[in-house]
């Protein structure tokens, strides 16, 4: 459907302009026609401003300075001893040992015998680490687990370590430790601190939880590490030195980077692909330095991989689970399991044989290392909740340890209880030649359930409603953090002059809710929360916590903006500035509040990013006679009036005459709030035109033109893009870029894999290979397979969109913007509403959105995914494996590319993505599996909620393409794909997004915050037109957060100190449009407006270690991709 913009000038110029336009239009259609021949193309015209017409048609971009190498460095791939991308496809994924579930075969046993008999080899040293893995929610909620298990476990740690001076323990989940601390007697608190000071109880990792590493976003990861580390430092007086990450389902490079930046010396990982376990064991590699994928300084933190399947005693004492089971001495009355069946206490009669068997298993682990130091976890999920287990494990193991250590002539070993820090210290004394590794360990696969490979790629997508809610909450928390820090310190400093006393107290009171919000976000980063892999009732509890804290964050934002935007302080105690979105209840989509000329005719926008942005904002109104006025620039802005359309049960569309969406364009400086006024005004040129074949015949809209759609395929068009839409489906078919006259096939499809029953569930993804892909839309399609009656097109001065409906299952919208912005005009927004309906409908359905393109990304397809919104990873299809093993996690984007074109798909939540066939990119949207996949939760996933998915598509030129080339291969296309190659340029080996994609991703994840000014109780009031909190901040730097530090003495009160966490994103200046010069340098002019900084210090990522004092913000420097933290005292 073509859109054209036209406005009549006064009579003297109107006819001339009209003739010129018709002539230009005819020439344009002849040369740049992008539609198939011999079909009747609909033409649409509607009035708009001439300024918009010019900018939209020509879309000239202001001249920009060329970026310097410092502003846009060409990043290089790091060089490592182990490259996971190169090595992984070479594995034998069906080795002969799968049926035994143990890779330990004769070759390993023979090597063990040789090493055991080598008299020059260092003596075996074994560090046994008692632990209890406490999930902060899984089969039960956080609170239920704490009351049922965890508080008893921590009490037993305190009591039994005092009783047994040789025993040690570790603790990782600070969320649980905080709950215990708040309820424990000071005597117990002191006893616990004493154990930590003695080094017998080690706090490992120190995060609020043990986070998932596939679905988490960098903001939430950093935030929960800061929250946990500060709790540890404040309450226990220590700084974590080692990490313990034994249960996340696969491991990526981001968490090791963050831990290294936080000052940890070593970390331990567990769950990686069974083939990686074998490969590393064969090469005696248990430790490595995990490099970032881009060339940067070598990390100082060492990563240790546990060599066997899982962290339970059955799998940790050595390569033979049947032997290890007999060394689990837990025996609780009424408990019967595989380990109780083999239970046998150590006595003087079996001491020698048991000690010999145990040390042989330990020695076998030692043969997998060059240094002969062995770390052996001793525990399992929620272990040691009974004091008798402490007694049994300690007494039996100490008998064997004492016997082994007393008979070195027989065993040649030292065995002791210890901690991970003890292990790393002992290992480093013997081993310095540690290899480096780059890449990651996704997809995780196990074989210990059935002796068959099972791929844990389902959880990348499971329960998308909660994944989306979590990201929305991140955005609201981040905005609340920044506003609280800026406004509270502003009024504190102004308060010295006697102002803002009441406002300061109100904000201080809200700080407690900010702490709870941080902790609820941190809790959801747990590897059974954001993954969607807890029981349905537990997921409901997580969601309710997120929803509650999201509500409080929005209220805090409103209070902060009320203080700063309303000059009349007597109004600060009232709820006048209100979010334009109402979150009524968990599980339901948010609603927009209506603006009104009676009491809500002012809108405030806050840009939470530290960079200027142009955004299209939509507010709801009860009138269409309206226009938008920027009170700061004192001018009217570009806007359009859109209909509110209701779909009836019979599929008929009702266009409302009482509810309207006002869409306008706003350009907002960094960390700035601007007020807009909605003025009564009648101008139908700003009203959208509706094309609809199935709108009620009797309905005659008094506001909008409603027209029938014309025959033929549908085109959406702005000044830069021309989209061809398949009329039979309503989905995108191809994209034509006018600036380089190039067509790209982008065929959007929706389908589903049928789940393999009992092999696909919350964790696992396994399609039923004997069943074809499911045509999920067929039951919701018209009998004639034509979508005409289910398509609505809405076209206006700012946007054009097409919506196609397969009710009630799926509603899909394609939107492009016709605004003078180089980013928004080049991007395509896809919005998909999915409702699985109540089970058993759509059972065993793994729903995907697929983009089939003509991009030549290799016969063995390659694509790129982000990792945690921080870095980027190349993915190569492994032909030996099925689709389930070729799905990878994304959190912000994925892209396909060849020598000429890159397609980037942006997302605002975690989901799985694959490029299983050449030119194809698909993302999983939602999953419903009726059956459990036998990985612990004991139920399927049937609690699907109606969910709205949003994605942006960017299609960009790769380096070397400078202009179009004639291509007559497609009928109707003229002068397409013409190009010429410029001088040879060295491309950046490390693939990063374009500057446009990087910027659009941040806009997508951190949208403008919109508020209404409610004057229903106070009448007309003064609202400041503009409030900027930042000046001369370098646009090449992303402000991750500006987070107030809690007072050292008053636990729930804020201090005047904050952490400013910064990230310098890496992006390519060679891909896509000519980049804007974005300086990463801070200057003497960089400041927070209205705030005095007493001092600033460079600190470790979580702030526990001071690195160096700075003279001011101008001393800050970040290299590309780096994340750094600075402590600011206001």
From Swiss-Prot:
Q: Which GO terms describe its biological process?
A: mannose metabolic process; N-glycan processing; protein glycosylation
State the organism of origin. Spodoptera frugiperda
- According to UniProt, the name of this protein is Alpha-mannosidase 2
Answer whether the UniProt record assigns the keyword Protein transport to this protein: no
Tell me the SUPFAM superfamilies matching this sequence: Families 57/38 glycoside transferase middle domain, Galactose mutarotase-like, Glycoside hydrolase/deacetylase
GO cellular component term of the entry, any: endoplasmic reticulum
Asked if the Swiss-Prot or TrEMBL record annotates the protein with the keyword Disulfide bond, the reply is yes
> Required co-factor?
Zn(2+)
According to UniProt, this protein's pathway is: Protein modification; protein glycosylation
Catalyzed chemical reaction(s): N(4)-{beta-D-GlcNAc-(1->2)-alpha-D-Man-(1->3)-[alpha-D-Man-(1->3)-[alpha-D-Man-(1->6)]-alpha-D-Man-(1->6)]-beta-D-Man-(1->4)-beta-D-GlcNAc-(1->4)-beta-D-GlcNAc}-L-asparaginyl-[protein] + 2 H2O = 2 alpha-D-mannopyranose + an N(4)-{beta-D-GlcNAc-(1->2)-alpha-D-Man-(1->3)-[alpha-D-Man-(1->6)]-beta-D-Man-(1->4)-beta-D-GlcNAc-(1->4)-beta-D-GlcNAc}-L-asparaginyl-[protein]
Where exactly are the transmembrane stretches of this chain? 15-35
Q: How is it modified after translation?
A: N-glycosylated.
Please state the protein's primary subcellular location. Answer: membrane
EC numbers on record: 3.2.1.114
Q: What does the cofactor section's free text say about binding?
A: Binds 1 zinc ion per subunit.
Binding of Zn(2+), residues? 133, 135, 247, 527
This molecule's function is given as:
Catalyzes the first committed step in the biosynthesis of complex N-glycans. It controls conversion of high mannose to complex N-glycans; the final hydrolytic step in the N-glycan maturation pathway.
Instruction: Tell me which stretches of the chain form a coiled coil.
Output: none
Q: Which family does it belong to?
A: Belongs to the glycosyl hydrolase 38 family.
Give the record's membrane topology. Answer: Single-pass type II membrane protein
Description of how the protein assembles with itself and partners:
Homodimer; disulfide-linked.
User: Where, subcellularly, is it found?
Assistant: Microsome membrane; Golgi apparatus membrane
């Amino acid at each position: 459907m073509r859109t054209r913009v036209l406005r009549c000038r006064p009579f003297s110029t109107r006819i001339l302009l009209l003739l010129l336009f018709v002539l230009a239009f005819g020439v344009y259609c002849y040369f740049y026609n992008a539609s198939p021949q011999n079909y009747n193309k609909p033409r649409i015209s509607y009035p708009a401003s001439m300024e918009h017409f010019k900018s939209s048609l020509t879309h000239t971009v202001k001249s920009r300075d060329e970026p310097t190498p410092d502003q846009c460095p060409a990043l290089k791939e790091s060089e490592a001893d182990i490259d996971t991308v190169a090595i992984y496809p070479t594995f034998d994924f069906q080795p002969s040992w799968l049926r035994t579930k143990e890779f330990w075969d004769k070759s390993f046993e023979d090597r063990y015998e040789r090493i055991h008999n080598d008299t020059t080899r260092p003596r075996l040293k074994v560090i046994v680490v008692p632990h209890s893995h406490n999930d902060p929610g899984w089969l039960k909620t956080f609170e239920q687990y704490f009351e049922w298990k965890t508080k008893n476990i921590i009490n037993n740690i305190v009591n039994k370590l005092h009783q047994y001076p040789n025993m040690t323990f570790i603790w990782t989940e600070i969320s649980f430790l905080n709950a215990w601390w708040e309820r424990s007697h000071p005597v117990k608190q002191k006893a616990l601190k004493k154990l930590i000071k003695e080094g017998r109880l080690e706090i490992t990792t120190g995060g609020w939880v043990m986070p998932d590493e596939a679905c988490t976003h960098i903001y939430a990861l950093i935030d929960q590490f800061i929250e946990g580390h500060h709790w540890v430092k404040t309450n226990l007086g220590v700084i974590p030195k080692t990490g313990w990450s034994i249960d996340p389902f696969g491991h990526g490079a981001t968490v090791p980077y963050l831990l290294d930046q936080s000052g940890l010396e070593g970390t331990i990982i567990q769950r990686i692909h069974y083939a990686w376990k074998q490969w590393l064991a064969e090469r005696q590699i248990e430790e490595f330095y995990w490099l970032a994928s881009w060339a940067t300084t070598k990390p100082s933190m060492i990563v240790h991989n546990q060599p066997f399947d899982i962290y339970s005693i059955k799998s940790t004492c050595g390569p033979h689970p049947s032997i290890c089971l007999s060394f689990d001495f837990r025996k609780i009355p009424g408990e019967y399991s595989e380990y109780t069946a083999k239970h046998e206490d150590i006595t003087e009669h079996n001491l020698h044989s048991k000690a010999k068997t145990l040390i042989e298993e330990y020695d076998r682990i030692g043969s997998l290392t060059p240094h002969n130091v062995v770390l052996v976890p001793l525990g399992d999920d929620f272990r040691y909740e009974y004091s008798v287990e402490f007694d049994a494990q300690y007494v039996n193991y100490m008998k064997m340890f004492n016997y082994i250590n007393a008979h070195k002539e027989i065993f040649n070993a030292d065995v002791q209880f210890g901690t991970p820090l003890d292990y790393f210290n002992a290992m480093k004394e013997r081993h310095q030649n540690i290899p480096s590794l780059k890449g990651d360990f996704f997809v995780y696969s196990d074989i210990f359930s059935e002796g068959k490979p099972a791929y844990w790629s389902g959880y990348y997508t499971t329960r998308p409603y909660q994944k989306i809610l979590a990201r929305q909450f991140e955005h609201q928390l981040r905005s609340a953090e920044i506003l609280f820090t800026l406004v509270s310190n502003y009024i504190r400093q102004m308060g010295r002059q006697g102002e803002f006393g009441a406002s300061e107290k109100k904000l201080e009171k809200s700080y407690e809710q900010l702490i709870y919000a941080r902790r609820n976000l941190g809790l959801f980063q747990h590897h059974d929360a954001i993954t969607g892999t807890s029981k349905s009732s537990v997921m409901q509890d997580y969601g309710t916590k997120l929803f509650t804290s999201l509500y409080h964050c929005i209220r805090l934002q409103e209070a902060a903006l009320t203080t700063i935007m309303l000059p009349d302080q007597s109004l600060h105690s009232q709820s006048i500035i209100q979010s334009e979105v109402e979150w009524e209840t968990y599980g339901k989509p948010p609603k927009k509040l209506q603006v009104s000329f009676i009491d809500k005719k002012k809108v405030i926008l806050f840009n939470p990013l530290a960079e200027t942005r142009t955004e299209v904002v939509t507010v709801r109104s009860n009138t269409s006679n309206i226009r938008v006025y920027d009170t700061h620039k004192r001018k009217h802005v570009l806007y359009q009036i859109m209909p509110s359309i209701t779909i009836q049960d019979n599929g008929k569309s009702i266009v409302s005459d009482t509810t309207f969406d006002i869409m306008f364009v706003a350009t907002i400086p960094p960390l700035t709030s601007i007020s807009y006024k909605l003025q009564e005004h009648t101008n139908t040129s700003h009203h959208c035109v509706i094309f609809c074949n199935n709108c009620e015949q009797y309905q005659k809209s008094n506001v909008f033109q409603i027209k029938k759609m014309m025959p033929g395929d549908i085109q959406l068009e702005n000044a830069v893009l021309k989209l061809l839409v398949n009329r039979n489906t309503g989905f995108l078919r191809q994209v034509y870029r006018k600036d380089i006259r190039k067509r790209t096939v982008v065929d959007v499809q929706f389908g589903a894999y049928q789940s393999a029953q009992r092999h696909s569930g919350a964790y696992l993804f396994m399609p039923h290979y004997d069943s074809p892909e499911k045509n999920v839309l067929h039951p919701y399609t018209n009998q004639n397979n034509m979508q005409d009656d289910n398509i609505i097109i809405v076209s206006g001065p700012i946007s054009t969109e097409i919506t196609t409906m397969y009710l009630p299952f799926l509603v899909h919208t394609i939107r492009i913007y016709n605004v003078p912005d180089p980013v928004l005009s080049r991007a395509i927004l896809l919005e998909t509403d999915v409702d699985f309906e109540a089970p058993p409908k759509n059972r065993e359905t793994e729903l995907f959105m697929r983009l089939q393109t003509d991009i030549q990304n290799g016969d063995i397809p390659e694509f790129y995914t982000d990792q945690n919104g921080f870095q980027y990873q190349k993915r190569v299809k492994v032909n030996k494996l099925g689709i389930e093993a070729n799905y990878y996690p994304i959190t912000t984007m994925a892209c396909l590319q060849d020598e000429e074109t890159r397609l980037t798909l942006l997302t605002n939540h975690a989901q799985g993505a694959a490029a299983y066939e050449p030119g194809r990119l698909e993302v999983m949207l939602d999953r419903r599996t009726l059956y459990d996949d036998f990985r612990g939760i004991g139920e399927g996933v049937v609690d699907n909620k109606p969910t709205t998915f949003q994605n942006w598509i960017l299609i960009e030129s790769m380096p070397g393409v400078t202009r179009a080339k004639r291509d007559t291969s497609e009928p109707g296309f003229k002068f397409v794909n013409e190009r010429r190659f410029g001088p040879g340029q060295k491309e950046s080996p490390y693939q990063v997004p374009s500057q446009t994609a990087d910027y659009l991703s941040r806009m997508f994840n951190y949208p403008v915050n919109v508020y209404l000014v409610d004057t229903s109780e106070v009448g007309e009031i003064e609202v400041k037109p503009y409030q900027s909190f930042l000046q001369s901040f370098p646009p090449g730097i992303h402000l991750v957060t500006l987070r107030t530090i809690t007072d050292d003495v008053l636990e729930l009160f804020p201090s005047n100190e904050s952490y400013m966490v910064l990230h310098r994103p890496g992006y390519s200046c060679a891909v896509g449009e000519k980049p804007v010069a974005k300086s990463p340098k801070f200057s003497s002019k960089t400041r927070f407006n209205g705030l005095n900084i007493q001092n600033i210090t460079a600190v470790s990522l979580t702030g526990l270690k001071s690195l160096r004092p700075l003279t001011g913000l101008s001393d800050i420097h970040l290299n590309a991709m780096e994340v750094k933290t600075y402590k600011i005292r206001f």
